[in-house]
């Protein structure tokens, strides 16, 4: 393992790490991954992670984690901000920083709605309710983006990586969900066209699925 490489630890799924992976790729950061594998049903053995969870000198042991020399960070958005600060991707003006802060929190609230649905044993019965309210939520993001190029304004920031990932997961869940929102679709295309992102999406380091872990009711399988 290179002493100069960051180490990203997470389950072998997209989950909360996908936006981090994309930001690492976009910023040309040298990194390696430590992927932990969850066991199969019915036990879903998590011992690969639990056996080392309290041995890594993490203040709040959890996944994902990022290790960068003496800096050891948990909480996915704290990791994103840590990387983004190194590359001036947290917004420049006060307006940009406010928009970044709003989006960081709003998109995570939105993410967790889909996460809770996907891991709920009553998933199939709850899915119609989620889909019914989805357009209203997407409309809010569409209005917030407006005619801006990126969600903070005209400057690419880490929340664009976060937002792309969450919108993409919803697009996989309901393929037509963005059709009513041309500016969101254009945002997705712009993001995918970024040179480093386009290269990552075509690389063997990228995987579309699984989004969730094996105990989830949706998004828990690889695409063959």
Swiss-Prot record:
GO molecular function, one term: identical protein binding
Gene3D superfamilies assigned to the protein according to its UniProt record, in alphabetical order: 1.20.1050.10, Glutaredoxin
PROSITE patterns, A to Z: GST_CTER, GST_NTER
Every GST N-terminal domain range: 4-91
EC number(s) given by UniProt: 2.5.1.18
SUPFAM superfamilies named in the record: GST C-terminal domain-like (SSF47616), Thioredoxin-like (SSF52833)
Modified residues (Phosphoserine): 5
Cellular component aspect of the GO annotation: cytosol; sperm fibrous sheath
Binding site for substrate: 119
A Gene Ontology BP annotation from the UniProt entry: response to estrogen
Compartments where located: Cytoplasm
Protein family membership: Belongs to the GST superfamily. Mu family.
Protein name from the UniProt record: Glutathione S-transferase Mu 5
Organism name: Mus musculus
